[in-house]
Amino acid sequence: MRGAMKPSIVHCLKLLMLLALGGVTMHVPDEDDVVASLGALRLDGHFSFDDAHAAARDFGNRCSLLPAAVLHPGSVSDVAATVRRVFQLGRSSPLTVAARGHGHSLLGQSQAAGGIVVKMESLAAAAARAVRVHGGASPHVDAPGGELWINVLHETLKHGLAPRSWTDYLHLTVGGTLSNAGVSGQAFRHGPQVSNVNQLEIVTGRGEVVTCSHEVNSDLFYAALGGLGQFGIITRARIALEPAPKMVRWIRVLYSDFETFTEDQEKLIASEKTFDYIEGFVIINRTGILNNWRTSFKPQDPVQASQFQSDGRVLYCLELTMNFNHDEADIMEQEVGALLSRLRYISSTLFYTDVTYLEFLDRVHTSELKLRAQGLWEVPHPWLNLLIPRSTVHKFAKEVFGKILKDSNNGPILLYPVNRTKWDNRTSVVIPDEEIFYLVGFLSSAPSSSGHGSVEHAMNLNNKIVDFCEKNGVGMKQYLAPYTTQKQWKAHFGARWETFERRKHTYDPLAILAPGQRIFPKASLPMSL
């Protein structure tokens, strides 16, 4: 793996190199000084100094920056006291603080070189921070920021309720996804997860604990949602719920024509009576697709399905679900049949299965366990996630799937539309300026140190895709963006940069929080970097 790690190390050290070349002297805190300073704090939890390596790893597995200490908070006051102590050290201190959820960041965004990493799952484990479900006319759940969504789901299902909007993978923390957006196949109807939050509890960069909502401290509320951790650490969230179904009809069909595929998707998300979950995938040069499906799905027509050949083709998979309860099975069958009759998929490729609601939502974890068993989970993940306007998605697809990725890819490719009206433009999330845009995710893995399975190969393809978008007016925005300079971030935010910067100076004026996003250097450093 040595060949795969070399460019990552260079990437992580880029900022330090810039400082050295610019003649800037960077004071690195002596560990004994850090220990003494932090040890004076009275905490419900504790600091540790021997698990720094674990806090310097993430899902992306391409960047490793060691912190000076890891905070295992036993209360919100622990988080606040720690941030407040760093704030009191002032501009001369290089100490920063990063909240780490389940470590699913892609390029060190949850890391803090020489700083403090807050292990948010420790906060969730504290008894006083338990998940609390409330029914009534406006059902909601109060959940710790460090709680995993899968645990939130288990708790809400006990009350026959569930959050409305999800991510595809549930073993992520509440605060982590709300700091980005949180998108899955329900977003066309309910918006991303950040559009389904009623209230937040936040520790700001000044060490203040603030409760905020649409009505109270609303500027901080909207700043933190999709705010990449720049304005505060989300320690608790109140999330809207809906009645949870017992079962899900899970459907997959294939298309050979991109235009037909996207037209059908757009038709479905525009309809009031439609499926509950709508996602699309691009499948490049895969053999035996339908045979693979047979392990979990059954074909509508086994004979036709057995004659279908996928070799050497670019195909498009539409994945759909309809929720139902056991006594509604007949009605569900009728509604599914009526909706499918309007679609123009390849008739021999209709596959379906019925699973529990929990089983469907936690589907990616099943794949995770298989990959872990094969040693293929903890490998580099050079992902690229784009938001593409509807007006340019065909131009994008022709170049990317017809030329750049025509031979192969090393992971799933997501492609599905969402409605802009379901996204709240008061949050910090940046999206294209069109009513319909597509989420396109290239979820690559790099299990090899060379060749097609390497980080270098995946990054080369990613760079070609981004370069095409930038040079041909595609109007894309990156989601989970891996930018490393403030210049890139300014271009990303565009006209919204001024608001983003104002909020930063208001809630985290010393740039203590989330240094791994590489947006605002610590206040003692030159802002030009």
UniProtKB/Swiss-Prot annotation:
GO terms for biological process: cytokinin metabolic process. Glycans are attached at N285, N419, N425. The modification Pros-8alpha-FAD histidine is found at H104. GO terms for molecular function: cytokinin dehydrogenase activity; FAD binding; oxidoreductase activity. InterPro entries: Cytok_DH_C_sf, Cytokinin_DH_FAD/cytokin-bd, FAD-bd_PCMH, FAD-bd_PCMH-like_sf, FAD-bd_PCMH_sub1, FAD-bd_PCMH_sub2, FAD-linked_Oxase-like_C, FAD-linked_Oxidoreductases_BP. Its EC number is 1.5.99.12. It comes from the Eukaryota. It catalyses: N(6)-dimethylallyladenine + A + H2O = 3-methyl-2-butenal + adenine + AH2. Residues 1-27 form the signal peptide. FAD binds at A99, G101, G103, S105, Q109, D168, T173, S179, V183, I234, Y479, Q517. Residues 63-244 form the FAD-binding PCMH-type domain. Pfam families: Cytokin-bind, FAD_binding_4. Expressed in inflorescence meristems. Keywords: FAD, Flavoprotein, Glycoprotein, Oxidoreductase, Secreted, Signal. The keyword Secreted applies. Its cofactor is FAD. The keyword Nuclease does not apply. It is found in: Secreted, Extracellular space. One of its GO terms (cellular component) is extracellular region. Monomer. Catalyzes the oxidation of cytokinins, a family of N(6)-substituted adenine derivatives that are plant hormones, where the substituent is an isopentenyl group. Belongs to the oxygen-dependent FAD-linked oxidoreductase family. This is Cytokinin dehydrogenase 4. It comes from Oryza sativa subsp. japonica. The lineage of its organism: Eukaryota, Viridiplantae, Streptophyta, Embryophyta, Tracheophyta.
